[in-house]
Each structure stands twice: as structure tokens, then as C-alpha cells.
């Protein structure tokens, strides 16, 4: 992994009671060595693999102003990180889910792009066995479960300040509250809506197929082609590029897919991140609720699975063998 650490600082938040978060500030930057590089490579990998929300700084963002001063050399990185940790404590303390942790600020380069990553990492307790086979307690940073993380694409921010996607953050296991916390700390507003972009893509595909009057099987085959490209991009960690997608797809009528989507006003970006859950709707129907969970290939609709809209009833012809076996055993036990 081509990841080069420029500067990294660690501080700590300690929860004393329900209302108090104390700050412990480090007096120097963390020296870059093999252990630090391995930690950052793992954190970068974990963060890159998770779903993220996008944002951009508000005009009055204190953190953005401080970061600009640091980038210009008017304030050193350590001072920037110490002041930001204080603001982080003030914002985090407002929320009931607030916990202590190690606060990490790392400025690094990856594939010619500069990033600033900010994270609050939890410490976990575990056991270790030494060479004498004695047991002792140990602590480690729970990087794989990190959910309080934000990252600023410094290259994008400085070269394209009008962008709506240079700032990303995780929604976290406690949902929207973590998003709100980061928005407050970063003084940021919501940016690119990834799910909306993906929903717009799906609508554009359906409308394009309908405009060409494709039959059911042809339409589903077209959706499958769209899904194959988008899923490849998702697996590679790359964005969906409309121009490339249009080149991959057969042209229907006089206009290719990119021309059609631009003229019909779907407000799609030239490229945007793939959203796994939304894209799955290209090839599958899925839903759950009331103790029922259903997931089936779209091709099965009107073939083996039939929906009666008037009565809101699904009829399934031919159940999966493992399900049928369970039903037969249950029926036989009565």
C-alpha cells in the first residue's frame, strides 16, 4: 500500500462521569515508524471499505479556518490538533453516547492525494501469552470497529473548493447521532447524497429501457449489465462514471445512456460512489417486516413469483428445497 505519513498526532479523551470528558494532550507529534505505518494502513483500509456520508465546510467553520492556517504554515500541526481536540471534546460531550478514546489526527498521502483523517479510537482489553506461557492483560486499539472517523480530501478541497464531496464521515453504529456530532465538530453541511445519486441512476435506467420499449427479459438483461459494471466499480473502490457506463451499454435508439440521462434532468454527477443496497435493486427484490423477510431475483417475478396488487399478496410456485424440508418436518410433527 502506497501510503506516506506526513504528520500524525495522538491525544486522549477520558470519560470521568456522565457529564465530564477530560482531555490529555500529547506534547509532540508521534514519530513515524513501522508500527505507526502499519496502524495507519489498517485504518485507511477499514475506512475505505465502509459506507460514508459526504459533506463540505460551512463558511464559518472554525476547524476549516484552523486547517487553512496550518496548511499555510501559520500554525504547526501539533497546535492545530491540540486545539481541535478541545473542540472535539466540547461537541462530543453534548451527546449521551459520548465515550472516551484515543483521538488521532493524521495527514498522509495515498496515490498522490493528500488526506487529513480524524478519528476517535476505542481501546479494548484482552489477554496475551508471553514466551514463558504466562498470561497478562493488554490493551489494543479497536480499529476494525472504528466508527467515529472523518476524512478530508485536502487535494480536492484546495483545488476545487466548490466541491460537495471533499469531506467524508461514517454514520456509525449509533446511526444519525454520530453524523450529527461530526457535522457539529467540523462545522459542515451535507454534501453529495450518494443514495440519491444511485436512486437517480436506477430511475434513469428504467426510463431509458421504457423509452426504447424493451420487453421484460430485455429490460432485465439491460439492468444486469448496469449492475455488473457498477458492482465491479464498487468492488474496486472506484466510482460509477456515467461516460464509461454509457460506453459499456448498448445504445438504445438515437441517444446513448449518458445523453438520455443528461437531457431528462436526473441531476446525476459525472461520477459518484456506488451504493451497494440501492444497486442491488437492479437485480433483486427484497424486503422485511412483521417477522417476514423476502429476497428473490427480479427475473422470477411473473415466472415463479406473482404479486396481486389488489390484495397485496405474493404467490410463490416452487419453494427452495431447504425451506420445503423445514415446512414438511413442521407439518409432520403436528
Swiss-Prot record:
Keywords: Cytoplasm. Coiled coil: none annotated. One of its GO terms (cellular component) is cytoplasm. It holds the Pfam family NA37. Its main location: cytoplasm. It is found in: Cytoplasm, Nucleoid. GO terms for molecular function: double-stranded DNA binding; single-stranded RNA binding. NCBIfam families: PRK00378.1 (NF001557). Belongs to the YejK family. This is Nucleoid-associated protein YPN_2714. It comes from Yersinia pestis bv. Antiqua (strain Nepal516). The lineage of its organism: Bacteria, Pseudomonadati, Pseudomonadota, Gammaproteobacteria, Enterobacterales.
Amino acid at each position: 500500500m502506497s501510503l506516506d505519513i506526513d504528520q500524525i498526532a495522538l491525544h486522549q479523551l477520558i470519560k470521568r462521569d456522565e457529564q465530564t470528558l477530560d482531555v490529555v494532550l500529547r506534547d509532540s507529534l508521534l514519530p513515524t515508524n513501522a508500527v505507526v505505518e502499519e496502524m495507519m494502513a489498517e485504518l485507511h483500509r477499514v475506512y475505505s471499505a465502509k459506507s460514508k456520508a459526504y459533506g463540505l465546510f460551512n463558511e464559518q467553520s472554525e476547524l476549516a479556518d484552523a486547517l487553512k492556517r496550518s496548511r499555510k504554515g501559520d500554525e504547526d500541526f501539533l497546535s492545530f490538533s491540540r486545539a481541535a481536540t478541545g473542540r472535539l471534546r466540547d461537541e462530543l460531550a453534548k451527546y449521551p453516547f459520548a465515550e472516551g478514546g484515543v483521538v488521532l489526527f493524521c495527514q498522509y498521502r495515498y496515490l498522490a492525494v493528500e488526506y487529513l483523517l480524524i478519528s476517535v479510537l476505542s481501546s479494548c482489553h484482552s489477554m496475551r501469552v508471553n514466551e514463558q506461557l504466562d498470561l497478562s492483560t493488554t490493551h489494543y486499539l479497536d480499529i476494525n470497529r472504528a466508527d467515529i472517523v472523518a476524512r478530508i480530501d485536502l487535494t480536492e478541497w484546495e483545488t476545487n473548493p466548490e466541491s460537495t464531496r471533499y469531506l467524508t464521515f461514517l454514520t456509525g453504529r449509533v446511526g444519525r447521532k454520530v453524523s450529527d456530532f461530526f457535522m457539529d465538530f467540523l462545522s459542515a453541511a451535507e454534501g453529495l447524497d450518494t443514495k440519491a445519486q444511485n436512486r437517480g441512476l436506477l430511475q434513469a435506467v428504467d426510463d431509458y429501457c421504457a423509452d426504447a420499449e424493451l420487453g421484460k427479459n430485455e429490460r432485465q438483461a439491460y439492468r444486469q449489465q448496469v449492475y455488473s459494471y457498477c458492482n465491479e466499480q464498487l468492488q474496486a473502490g472506484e466510482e460509477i462514471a456515467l461516460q464509461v457506463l454509457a460506453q459499456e451499454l448498448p445504445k438504445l435508439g438515437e441517444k446513448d445512456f449518458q445523453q438520455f440521462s443528461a437531457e431528462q434532468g436526473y441531476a446525476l454527477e459525472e461520477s459518484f460512489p456506488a451504493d451497494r443496497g440501492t444497486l442491488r435493486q437492479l437485480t433483486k427484490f427484497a424486503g422485511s417486516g412483521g417477522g417476514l423477510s423476502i429476497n428473490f431475483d427480479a427475473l422470477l417475478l411473473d415466472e415463479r413469483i406473482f404479486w396481486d396488487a389488489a390484495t397485496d399478496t405474493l404467490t410463490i410456485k416452487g419453494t427452495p428445497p431447504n425451506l420445503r424440508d423445514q415446512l414438511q418436518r413442521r407439518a409432520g410433527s403436528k
